[in-house]
Protein backbone atom coordinates (compact mmCIF):
# COMPACT_ATOMS: atom_id res chain seq x y z
CA UNK A 1 0.00 0.00 0.00
CA UNK A 2 1.25 3.47 -0.75
CA UNK A 3 0.02 6.95 0.08
CA UNK A 4 -0.35 9.66 -2.54
CA UNK A 5 -0.80 13.42 -2.23
CA UNK A 6 -4.59 13.18 -2.59
CA UNK A 7 -4.79 10.73 0.31
CA UNK A 8 -2.70 12.97 2.56
CA UNK A 9 -4.90 15.96 1.74
CA UNK A 10 -8.07 13.93 2.32
CA UNK A 11 -6.88 12.65 5.70
CA UNK A 12 -5.80 16.16 6.72
CA UNK A 13 -9.23 17.48 5.77
CA UNK A 14 -11.01 14.71 7.70
CA UNK A 15 -8.80 15.40 10.73
CA UNK A 16 -9.39 19.13 10.29
CA UNK A 17 -5.65 19.80 10.15
CA UNK A 18 -4.32 22.67 8.06
CA UNK A 19 -1.53 21.28 5.88
CA UNK A 20 0.39 23.35 3.36
CA UNK A 21 1.34 21.95 -0.05
CA UNK A 22 4.99 21.55 1.04
CA UNK A 23 3.99 19.77 4.26
CA UNK A 24 1.64 17.46 2.35
CA UNK A 25 4.39 16.55 -0.11
CA UNK A 26 6.79 15.81 2.76
CA UNK A 27 4.14 13.71 4.53
CA UNK A 28 3.69 11.53 1.46
CA UNK A 29 7.29 10.34 1.81
CA UNK A 30 7.11 9.99 5.57
CA UNK A 31 3.88 8.00 5.53
CA UNK A 32 5.15 5.74 2.74
CA UNK A 33 8.28 5.11 4.83
CA UNK A 34 6.16 4.16 7.84
CA UNK A 35 3.98 1.85 5.75
CA UNK A 36 7.09 0.26 4.26
CA UNK A 37 8.37 -0.48 7.75
CA UNK A 38 5.02 -2.02 8.73
CA UNK A 39 5.15 -4.21 5.62
CA UNK A 40 8.62 -5.39 6.67
CA UNK A 41 7.22 -6.35 10.08
CA UNK A 42 4.53 -8.47 8.43
CA UNK A 43 7.29 -10.51 6.74
CA UNK A 44 8.90 -11.52 10.06
CA UNK A 45 8.48 -15.21 10.88
CA UNK A 46 6.85 -15.38 14.32
CA UNK A 47 5.89 -19.04 14.20
CA UNK A 48 6.32 -20.57 17.63
CA UNK A 49 6.70 -17.20 19.35
CA UNK A 50 4.24 -16.76 22.19
CA UNK A 51 2.15 -13.61 22.01
CA UNK A 52 2.74 -11.17 24.85
CA UNK A 53 1.48 -7.80 25.99
CA UNK A 54 4.58 -6.79 27.94
CA UNK A 55 8.26 -7.66 27.98
CA UNK A 56 8.12 -8.16 31.74
CA UNK A 57 5.81 -10.74 33.31
CA UNK A 58 2.83 -9.13 34.97
CA UNK A 59 0.81 -11.49 37.15
CA UNK A 60 -2.62 -10.14 37.89
CA UNK A 61 -3.92 -10.61 41.41
CA UNK A 62 -7.10 -12.67 41.28
CA UNK A 63 -10.17 -11.71 43.26
CA UNK A 64 -13.62 -13.13 43.69
CA UNK A 65 -16.02 -12.10 40.94
CA UNK A 66 -18.62 -10.60 43.25
CA UNK A 67 -20.75 -7.49 42.94
CA UNK A 68 -19.95 -4.92 45.65
CA UNK A 69 -20.43 -1.22 46.13
CA UNK A 70 -16.67 -0.85 46.52
CA UNK A 71 -16.95 0.41 50.09
CA UNK A 72 -15.42 3.69 48.92
CA UNK A 73 -18.47 5.98 48.69
CA UNK A 74 -17.47 8.06 51.72
CA UNK A 75 -13.90 8.45 50.42
CA UNK A 76 -15.12 9.47 46.96
CA UNK A 77 -17.41 12.26 48.16
CA UNK A 78 -15.13 13.38 51.02
CA UNK A 79 -13.85 16.45 49.13
CA UNK A 80 -17.15 17.38 47.49
CA UNK A 81 -18.54 20.73 48.66
CA UNK A 82 -22.14 19.45 48.87
CA UNK A 83 -23.38 15.86 49.04
CA UNK A 84 -26.59 14.00 49.85
CA UNK A 85 -26.52 10.31 50.79
CA UNK A 86 -23.13 9.80 49.07
CA UNK A 87 -24.25 11.57 45.89
CA UNK A 88 -22.64 14.72 44.53
CA UNK A 89 -24.97 17.72 44.54
CA UNK A 90 -24.33 20.24 41.79
CA UNK A 91 -25.96 23.59 41.12
CA UNK A 92 -28.80 23.61 38.62
CA UNK A 93 -27.49 24.95 35.32
CA UNK A 94 -30.49 24.44 33.03
CA UNK A 95 -33.80 26.18 33.63
From Swiss-Prot:
Residues of the signal peptide: none
PANTHER family referenced in this protein's UniProt entry, alphabetically: GLUTAMYL-TRNA(GLN) AMIDOTRANSFERASE SUBUNIT C, MITOCHONDRIAL
Top-rank lineage group of the source organism: Bacteria
HAMAP family found in the cross-reference section: GatC (MF_00122)
Assembly and interaction partners: Heterotrimer of A, B and C subunits.
Protein name per the record: Aspartyl/glutamyl-tRNA(Asn/Gln) amidotransferase subunit C
Keywords: ATP-binding, Ligase, Nucleotide-binding, Protein biosynthesis
Single GO BP term: glutaminyl-tRNAGln biosynthesis via transamidation
EC numbers on record: 6.3.5.-
Catalytic reaction list: L-glutamyl-tRNA(Gln) + L-glutamine + ATP + H2O = L-glutaminyl-tRNA(Gln) + L-glutamate + ADP + phosphate + H(+); L-aspartyl-tRNA(Asn) + L-glutamine + ATP + H2O = L-asparaginyl-tRNA(Asn) + L-glutamate + ADP + phosphate + 2 H(+)
Any GO MF annotation of the entry: ATP binding
Record keyword Hydrolase present: no
Similarity field: Belongs to the GatC family.
Enzyme class name: ligase
Gene assigned in the entry: gatC
Amino acid sequence: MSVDLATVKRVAKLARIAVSEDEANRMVGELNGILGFVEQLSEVNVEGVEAMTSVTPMAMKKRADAVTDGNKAADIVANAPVTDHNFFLVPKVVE
